[in-house]
């Protein structure tokens, strides 16, 4: 169970301290609730110096932020290239049914104030390796109940006895490249699923048999490859197998885990994307809004919750440092997740009048028309049909 909150008479002093650090008022209640349970935790504002709406708009570029196809319709975008108005379907942008996220859900997941709870806050935890606080025992807690727990696998003689456990490989890989092994485990579970059923680590892909990609590095849909195939193409060495960076070809799980960890350490953590949040929403450095590890808009929050499982209450009693982004011109309160569902298609497939002519000619994206009729006209009939057969049309008839 969680510890009892700190006495409320500390509240005013702590809020004053947070204000002095530069946290906006809208952050304070969530941070106080966390501090009252975990007084050793340290919260630091990470000032992006980026306008809030600018950042959200940059992440709203088609293809940068995706949601699963079964998400509520209000979570899915209808911008150009995201939705097929003719057949009322969202366009798949990545293998597995991933479609463009709506601006509203992007804003929700980008708003740090929505994730100031004892599990999701771990997306703001610094990702560096710390031998004193990151233990094999806690890693075992994180992976328990998943395919990573107590599992041995054939490493093709990359270790002295030819077998290893996922947990041990993740731990030593993290220690060797300077990244928290807890982060690596959370990433692998997020990318491969808790049951490990992803074809990325099966070794049996039809086009790239015998190759593995433990973190889905370079895995995205192209005209030639599915996302899994593109990731395995990268694992194989890419064009003609010529790529040898990061220990490629990854023809064993051992190589895929260690090589992928080294890739992540060099290209993300060392580049300043040293929290799960910044890995997903890169609002720092010279390559802002690019070099983002995933397109899943909920990825940072999801991995943060997975990461939190590694921290027992005893470990949470120690000092942990969280770097929490602050934007310029943020909304006064946290952006809620949209809740609406149903077809967004309110367009017409036809609009006709019995007398005169519409100006301009009917097109489904035009919302206003002018109608000029002869002076002697007494009545007109308006007829319209919806593009979505399940929709109804109001306002037709005789006038």
Task: Enumerate the language-model features and the residues they cover.
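Short, functionally critical alpha-helical segments immediately adjacent to catalytic or ligand/cofactor-binding
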Residues: 168-196
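Catalytic and binding regions of secreted/periplasmic enzymes and modules that target cell-wall glycans
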Residues: 190, 197-325
């Amino acid at each position: 169970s969680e510890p009892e909150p700190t006495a409320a008479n500390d509240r005013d002093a702590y809020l004053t301290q947070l204000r002095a650090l530069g946290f906006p008022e809208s952050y304070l209640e969530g941070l106080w609730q966390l501090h009252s349970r975990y007084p050793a935790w340290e919260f630091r504002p990470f000032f992006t110096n980026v306008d809030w709406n600018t950042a959200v708009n940059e992440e709203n570029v088609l293809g940068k932020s995706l949601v699963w196809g079964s998400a509520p319709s209000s979570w899915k975008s209808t911008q150009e290239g995201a939705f097929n108005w003719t057949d009322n379907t969202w366009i798949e942008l990545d293998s597995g049914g991933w479609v463009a996220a709506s601006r509203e859900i992007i804003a929700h997941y980008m708003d740090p104030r929505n994730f100031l709870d004892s599990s999701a806050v771990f997306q703001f935890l610094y990702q560096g390796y710390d031998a004193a606080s990151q233990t094999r025992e806690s890693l075992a807690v994180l992976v328990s109940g998943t395919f990573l727990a107590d599992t041995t696998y054939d490493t093709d003689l990359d270790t002295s006895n030819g077998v290893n456990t996922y947990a041990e490989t993740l731990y030593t890989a993290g220690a060797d490249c300077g990244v928290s092994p807890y982060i690596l485990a959370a990433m692998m579970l997020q990318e491969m699923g808790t049951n490990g059923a992803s074809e990325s680590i099966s070794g049996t892909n039809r086009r790239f048999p015998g190759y593995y990609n433990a973190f889905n590095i370079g895995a995205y849909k192209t005209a030639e490859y599915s996302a899994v195939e593109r990731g395995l193409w990268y694992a194989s060495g890419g064009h003609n197998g010529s790529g040898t960076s990061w220990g490629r070809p990854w023809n064993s799980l051992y190589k895929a885990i260690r090589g992928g960890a080294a890739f992540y350490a060099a290209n993300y953590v060392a580049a300043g994307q040293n929290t799960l949040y910044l890995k997903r929403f890169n609002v720092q450095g010279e390559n802002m809004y690019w070099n983002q590890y995933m397109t899943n808009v909920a990825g940072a929050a999801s991995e943060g919750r997975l990461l939190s499982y590694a921290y027992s209450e005893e470990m949470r009693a120690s000092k942990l440092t969280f770097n929490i982004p602050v934007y310029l011109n943020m909304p006064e309160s946290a952006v809620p997740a949209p809740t609406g569902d149903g077809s967004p298609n309110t367009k017409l497939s036809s609009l006709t009048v019995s007398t005169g002519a519409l100006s301009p000619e009917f097109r489904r994206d035009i919302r206003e028309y002018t109608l000029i009729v002869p002076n002697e006209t007494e009545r007109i009939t308006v007829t319209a049909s919806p593009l979505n057969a399940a929709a109804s049309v109001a306002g037709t008839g005789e006038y």
